[in-house]
Amino acid sequence: MKVDLNADLGESFGRYRLGLDEEVMKYITSANVATGWHAGDPLVMRKTVKLAKENGVAVGAHPGYPDLLGFGRRYMKLTYDEARNYILYQVGALYAFVRAEGIELQHVKPHGALYNALVKEEELARGVIEGIADFDKNLIFVTLSGSRPAEIAEEMGVKVAHEVFADRAYNPDGTLVPRSKPGAVIEDKEEIAERVISMVKDGGVRAINGEWVELKVDTICLHGDNPKAVEIAAHIRKVLEEEGVKIVPMKEIIR
């Protein structure tokens, strides 16, 4: 049994510092690097790509809405063409640094409000996936496990990684409970580990109302921007390995 561990990194910019990138990088196999629109800047992008290379971690682009002040967590209405070209632009920006460091770009994972909007808006999802395909159809599109965007990508011939979230509560329909609601973010490392094992070995997890939600798991998102991020990441990796699960980059799972 194999699974990838990913985290959103490179989200500092200018004088502002966010996340514990150097420490979290030790426990993951894929890094989602911010591409400058919701967070990140050229210096941070280069530094993060280099850090991933040094740690043997695969690199992916983490594009979002053009919303630096809102950290990409505010919804924006985009046309198909806007979505397609916004993604192409941001992926291309990160690829410049990936190429400069002599490594490969593995995947694309949309950020924040854009990630969530794809699940509800098929035209938006098609635009985003087309933008990925415009750049390189061999890139892996990371999206919410079992969601409509995953189906669309498969229909379009784009590789897909089904993603689950270690520290987020689920609705019965498999979507994430909004951060604004009580219980949306889980902070206890033992509870998080139990849920991750359930997802990987049992193929699902209990929703916030107690119902069972089936989930396909290719990659698990570990958030790197909370105070306990390093402790949680280390614990999850340890528990998975003790259960006999191999932790590998998603390119070794999605072929």
Swiss-Prot record:
One of its GO terms (biological process) is carbohydrate metabolic process. GO terms for molecular function: 5-oxoprolinase (ATP-hydrolyzing) activity; ATP binding. It catalyses: 5-oxo-L-proline + ATP + 2 H2O = L-glutamate + ADP + phosphate + H(+). InterPro entries: Glyco_hydro/deAcase_b/a-brl, LamB/YcsF/PxpA-like. Disulfide bonds: none annotated. It comes from the Archaea. Its EC number is 3.5.2.9. Pfam families: LamB_YcsF. Keywords: ATP-binding, Hydrolase, Nucleotide-binding. Belongs to the LamB/PxpA family. NCBIfam families: PRK05406.1-3, PRK05406.1-5. HAMAP family: PxpA (MF_00691). Catalyzes the cleavage of 5-oxoproline to form L-glutamate coupled to the hydrolysis of ATP to ADP and inorganic phosphate. Forms a complex composed of PxpA, PxpB and PxpC. This is 5-oxoprolinase subunit A. It comes from Thermococcus kodakarensis (strain ATCC BAA-918 / JCM 12380 / KOD1).
